[in-house]
Amino acid sequence: MRRYLIVAHKTLGGDHLIDHVRSLREEGPCRFLLLVPVQHPADHMWTEGEVTAAARRKLQEGLDRFHDEGIIADGEIGDANPVYAVSTVVRREGSGAFDGIVLSTLPPGPSRWLHLDVPSRMRREHPELPITHLVADRVAAH
């Protein structure tokens, strides 16, 4: 069974991502690991406990949406640096554990990850894995 690593935060559970996962499932059975990097807000003070709890809530919302759609998924939270978070998972699981990585971001402008060039950095860090970059048209409401 094919397995994909999905990396998202604000866009997790968005229709664009669910549609892509459905298209992957049309090609054959697959399962997914959702990785939600913690987010450090720039507009207010925060504690590590607060951002971890927020990431856990976002992960649970994503898992609930995937399960509601009949999609087999597990999940975890990761480091605030999404490239490092992915590298940690790939190192732990082994690069052969995944058939690909799906990275979901906000559009240019509001996307901090695009500003940091995360898609290109992730491709350089993991050339052995195909990386699909999806851009949401808005923050997931689910």
Put a short name on every predicted segment:
Residues S104-S120:
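Glycine-rich, Arg-bearing micro-motifs that act as flexible, cationic patches
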Residues G100, E125-H142:
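Glycine-rich, aromatic-bearing surface loops/beta-hairpins
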